[in-house]
Amino acid sequence: MKKLLPTSTAGSLPKPAWLAQPETLWSPWKLQGDELVEGKHDALRLSLHEQQLAGIDIVSDGEQTRQHFVTTFIEHLDGVDFENRETVRIRDRYDASVPTVVGAVARKKPVFVEDAKFLRQQTGQPIKWALPGPMTMIDTLYDAHYKSREKLAWEFAKILNQEAKELEAAGVDIIQFDEPAFNVFFDEVNDWGVATLERAIEGLKCETAVHICYGYGIKANTDWKKTLGSEWRQYEEAFPKLQKSSIDIVSLECHNSHVPMELIELIRGKKVMVGAIDVANHAIETPEEVANTLRKALQFVDADKLYPCTNCGMAPLPRRVARGKLNALSAGAEIVRRELLNAR
């Protein structure tokens, strides 16, 4: 991106009420068959339009065609049985009913490539596309086949690499891997987590990003955050390894969190998507609040490597709130952009 402080969203945006139940994760579709296909594309267009109206520079699909950032990808793979479910502990903090790996996992056909081509036809702006990361995928399943988290992660990394290469060919500019599990399983991150992420990006010429956050604004996550104390230093565990990795961009949570801003120093040299919008409450930030977060970040990251962003996806928020937050993100970035240009 040539523009200084290009804005983007971390992931999902709210779906329209005619497509799925608002403010709900894993909400079932309200349409079926051809109507659902058309409805998803209509929602994707609408999501793009709202990003453009807000002045977002790097746009996305708003994850309008998927029910969930992890399970929708897994649904398209062989070797996973969604009828045969088990209850597992997700991110080591809440129980969920998840599908079971019953055989060798494989991707017989592209998952999101047609959606990406459709989005590419709608805009000339840079596009970022999010995929679940290998470690977060294995943490959202019960494995009755490989019986090894690491082995399954390597298999998913190969599959993600196939998908990512086709997304790149479809015109995607940045491919982001969502890895909230990196904030929880520190030994695995350093033993093989970052290595499997490297496998997922192997051979890509487009830019790559990893998004690590403290989750959506749902009760299980907000309750967990209350146990983390006055300083959240989880990033300290993964950042040194990521700093040495081939990943181009690291996306992290900042605003209204207890993450010490100086931890960004640990990924010096990387581009940093700084979360300047809190997704865990309905209060809409002022542009000045956004600008303050960005000014603090600029102490630890060069201006040409700072990408203002949201802390996480906004699927569970009311559309009005998400719209207001996107507007604040753009306006706050513009304040700091002007300050930087005037100082030159």
Give the location of each predicted region.
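Domain-level signal for soluble alpha/beta catalytic cores
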Residues: 1-344
